[in-house]
């Protein structure tokens, strides 16, 4: 049995950002004919259960001390850019010989070189169960952006608004409500937040699975380790507005990007990646 645990403090809705990646893992484990469940704030101490934790930086010290030795921490943060408190938590977890999974080879290199922690790469692929966004024929939104705001993101969005582009920004909106906005948007915009510039596959894979057109910031400094870049509209920061304008005028090209995205990730069934990392 695998217990996929999402750490969600009271009144902290942002833990729901882990739901799709947790479901990706959960459904692929079920496809392997193994037992799996998704829980919130529940650490199973049964020796026959493996706990895989999302949001481990939200664990308090008491919970960290109670973790079984076979626990797996699934990191989705860009470690180079996280705060010192989380880095200290990572070191505390490492002393307990907890296993670390990460979606990014760059993160894993940072863990090894800076914190002397060896982790395992979790590759992200296609899971049919997550094909569930039914796009609307009539699009009310030109560009959808969801996530935290900072100056570099705000600059692009404000420039689009000044050009009368219908931009919808969401923060703290997850699950079905966010999916409904995706369904009625012409495209989704992905912009780097951190200077580490790791490609945000954890944010984008769900869009690819659902054939949603994605415009993503990609430049010579972007770090990525997947084969899905052919399925998105790649843009450096300076050209991203121009590329958005062009796509908004070309419905066929938008549809083509969405289909290419889905086909690019479909080549890599998640069951194979999950089987490999679990040594099944």
Sequence positions of predicted segments:
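Short, hydrophobic/aromatic alpha-helical segments in well-folded domains
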Residues: 203, 243, 260-261
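C-terminal low-complexity, acidic/polar tails when present
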Residues: 223-232, 240, 254
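A charged, aromatic-enriched C-terminal amphipathic alpha-helix characteristic of glycosyltransferases
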Residues: 248-280
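Nucleotide-sugar donor-binding catalytic core of glycosyltransferases
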Residues: 2-48, 55-229, 272, 276
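Short alpha-helical scaffold segments that flank and stabilize functional sites
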Residues: 25, 219, 246, 261-264
């Amino acid at each position: 049995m695998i217990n996929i645990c999402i750490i969600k403090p009271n009144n902290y809705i942002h833990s729901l950002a882990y739901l799709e990646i947790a479901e990706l893992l959960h459904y692929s484990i079920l496809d392997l004919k193994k037992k799996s469940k998704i829980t919130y704030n529940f650490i199973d101490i049964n020796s026959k259960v493996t706990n895989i934790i999302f949001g481990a930086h939200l664990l308090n010290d008491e919970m960290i001390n109670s973790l079984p030795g076979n626990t797996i921490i699934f990191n989705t943060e860009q470690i180079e850019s996280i705060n010192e408190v989380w880095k200290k938590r990572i070191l505390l977890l490492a002393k307990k010989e907890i296993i670390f999974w990460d979606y990014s080879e760059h993160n894993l290199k940072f863990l090894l070189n800076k914190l002397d922690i060896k982790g395992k790469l979790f590759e992200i692929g296609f899971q049919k169960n997550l094909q569930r966004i039914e796009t609307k024929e009539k699009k009310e939104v030109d560009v959808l952006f969801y996530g935290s705001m900072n100056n570099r993101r705000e600059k692009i969005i404000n420039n689009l608004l000044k050009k009368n582009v219908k931009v919808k920004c969401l923060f703290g909106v997850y699950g079905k409500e966010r999916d409904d906005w995706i369904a009625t948007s012409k495209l989704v915009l992905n912009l780097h937040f951190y200077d580490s510039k790791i490609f945000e596959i954890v944010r984008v894979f769900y869009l690819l699975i659902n054939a949603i057109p994605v415009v993503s910031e990609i430049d010579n400094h972007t770090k990525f380790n997947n084969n899905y870049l052919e399925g998105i509209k790649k843009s450096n920061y300076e050209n991203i507005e121009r590329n958005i304008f062009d796509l908004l005028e070309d419905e066929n090209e938008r549809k083509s990007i969405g289909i290419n995205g889905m086909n690019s990730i479909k080549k890599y069934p998640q069951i194979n990646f999950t089987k490999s990392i679990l040594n099944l």
